[in-house]
């Protein structure tokens, strides 16, 4: 489609990045591997802003290549990794996957589309990302609106959009009546 102009303030993107990083418990000891593009909010806000506002380090890759990602995590001892589900599938299925030590990983973000529970479990088990989260958002919301918690059960991380981030108000509207739904309605 056509590009859209979206007005984002410095406060919006800084605060959103900070809250994303806090949700993943980033500290100055964290190193995030970013194989996602920086021209998109996923890379620049959820990635760069999240890690620098929480004092950590970004390991930036020129483009996505599963072998380069695995080698970078291994060499740089990254503690976090970002991607969309298909990127994680490509990494897990790479023929050289078992040659890399990924035990430094603990968290990250899987976003961009629905994450099947089986994939979330494989990433947690085979890539050691026990605290991986999912984020839902829009460019217009700077971009994160909701995020799962690092200690949410895997079923919650894979089947929901998580909880609203600080400063975000969420309402669920009945599409037929356009009325706000009471808490607990499904």
Q: Regions from the language model: what does each represent?
A:
Residues 70, 75-83, 92-156, 169:
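Gly/Ser/Thr-rich phosphate-binding loop
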Residues 171-186:
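Conserved beta-loop-beta connector loops within the AMP-binding
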């Amino acid at each position: 489609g056509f590009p859209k102009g979206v007005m984002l303030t410095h406060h919006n993107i800084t605060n959103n990045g900070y809250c994303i990083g806090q949700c993943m418990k980033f500290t100055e000891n964290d190193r995030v591997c970013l194989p996602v593009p920086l021209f998109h909010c996923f890379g620049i806000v959820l990635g760069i802003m999240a890690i620098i506002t929480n004092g950590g380090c970004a390991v930036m890759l020129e483009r996505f290549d599963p072998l380069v990602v695995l080698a970078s995590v291994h060499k740089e001892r990254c503690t976090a990794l970002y991607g969309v589900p298909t990127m994680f599938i490509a990494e897990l299925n790479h023929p050289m996957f078992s040659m890399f030590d990924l035990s430094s990983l603990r968290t990250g973000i899987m976003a961009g589309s629905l994450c099947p529970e089986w994939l979330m479990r494989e990433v947690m088990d085979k890539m050691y990302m026990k605290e991986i989260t999912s984020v839902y958002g829009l460019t217009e919301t700077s971009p994160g609106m909701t995020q799962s918690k690092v200690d949410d059960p895997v079923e919650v991380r894979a089947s929901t959009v998580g909880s609203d981030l600080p400063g975000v108000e969420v309402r669920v509207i009945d599409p037929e009546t356009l009325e706000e739904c009471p808490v607990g309605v499904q």
